[in-house]
Amino acid sequence: GVSVTDIDGNLASSQITVNNGTLSVSLAGGATISAGANGSSTMTISGSEAQINTALASIVYQSNADFNGADVFTIVSTDSAGTPLSDIDTVGITVNPVNDPPVNTLPGAQTVDEDTPLNFVGVSVNDIDGNLASTQLSVNNGTLNVTLTGGTTITAGSNGSGTLTLSGTQTDINATLASLVYQGDLNFNGSDVLTMISADSAGTPLSDTDTVSITVNP
């Protein structure tokens, strides 16, 4: 655990800091935060030695979202002598990477007239780990068409059908998604839904499913 001892009994404060995350402590023991803030990357805990140690015993570190790599926990404890003295120590923290699912972006609800093509704007996908594998698009009462860009291929379904699966790099898939066109079935009017499922290529693949409603006016 993390603790501090002052043999003279005049401990005043302990400052704790990390570079790539946040720190939280419990103040139930009576310590106060005199600088920084709970749930931030740095704070200074003040109180008696017992109060400070109670707070230090409750430290929780949370890395920043999607961060992995090396971080450093630094503690600087200072006494209240006429000429204050301090002690500085550090602990290395290794944050291992974990797979994150891809994230789809879709526009809001769409409206189009019967027998009129609808050009989708704002359809994209992002995988922060860079291992996007595929994006499946489907509708119930119409067809979808895309212009294949770069090395993107259709690995299931087909252009001009109600469902198709795009495979390729994230850049190429997004360039292809920018060309997405919906066409309702002949003489169809009513409600339809575009469903988008993007999956990554991790050992245990993760996916994101999103939908956008389409109203086809008569």
PLM regions: where:
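Extracellular glycosylation-rich, acidic/polar low-complexity regions of adhesion-
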Residues: 1-218
